[in-house]
């Protein structure tokens, strides 16, 4: 599913968190949004997901105007996301968190699973193994380490079988091994799944993204391939430095 934003402006009083930002992510593209702290990256994801209403501008998902739609309607269109802050059910086990996400996708709550309970259990097991967290299945989410929680959050977003996935700093706080595991998981996603990732881990961005959008103080300052962005003098000045 393609997604686009045109002329997005978000004002909080006199502050413009976004100022006429355009974004185009083609269906199946892996795109990253980078920039310094306070650049407006998370605000951009929040507007695309429907968490914030733009002061000006519009959002389209799969060619449809999604600007007036609440988050749950956008999710029904196939949009999934993760957040900077944890959204796990800490008292439930890792497996139960994933099971709940799968049931939500099927709009079945806890009471009904289309087909059989075996079907649910099999899908949960597949997703645990795909995320490399099968050994944590019975552990309460509240007892996970920070990196383990981040990995589970990615798996919860994927359990919704999204057509487009918004990821907000999925590498934050991960160990080297966890980082490689998450990067491999994202690389293995079906090509038809669109990925838009906000991330400070520049090495991960350049390893994953086909296109990169750079924000600074709410303004888009660059947009292009990783090679083009790395060579951009303005991006070097405000963000990449000597990388």
Feature roles, as predicted:
Residues 2-243:
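Glycine-rich phosphate-binding loops of nucleotide-dependent enzymes
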């Amino acid at each position: 599913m393609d997604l686009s934003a045109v002329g997005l402006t978000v004002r909080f009083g006199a502050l413009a968190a976004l100022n006429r930002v355009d974004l185009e992510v083609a269906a199946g593209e892996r795109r990253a949004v980078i920039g310094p702290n306070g650049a407006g990256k998370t605000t951009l994801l929040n507007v695309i997901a429907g968490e914030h209403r733009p002061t000006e501008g519009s959002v389209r998902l799969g060619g449809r105007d999604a600007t007036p739609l609440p988050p749950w309607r956008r999710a029904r269109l196939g949009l999934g996301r993760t957040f900077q802050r944890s959204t796990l059910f800490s008292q439930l086990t890792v497996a139960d968190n994933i099971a709940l996400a799968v049931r939500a996708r099927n709009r079945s709550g806890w009471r009904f699973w289309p087909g059989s309970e075996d079907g649910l259990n099999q899908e949960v097991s597949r997703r645990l193994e795909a995320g490399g967290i099968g050994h944590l299945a019975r552990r309460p989410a509240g007892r996970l380490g920070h990196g383990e929680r981040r990995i589970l959050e990615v798996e919860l977003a994927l359990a919704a079988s999204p057509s487009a996935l918004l990821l907000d700093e999925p590498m934050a706080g991960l160990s080297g091994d966890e980082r490689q595991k998450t990067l491999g998981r994202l690389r293995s996603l079906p090509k038809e799944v669109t990925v838009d990732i906000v991330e400070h881990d520049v090495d991960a961005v350049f390893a994953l993204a086909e296109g990169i959008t750079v924000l600074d103080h709410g303004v888009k300052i660059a947009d292009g391939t990783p090679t083009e962005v790395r060579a951009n003098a303005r991006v070097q000045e405000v963000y990449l430095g000597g990388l």
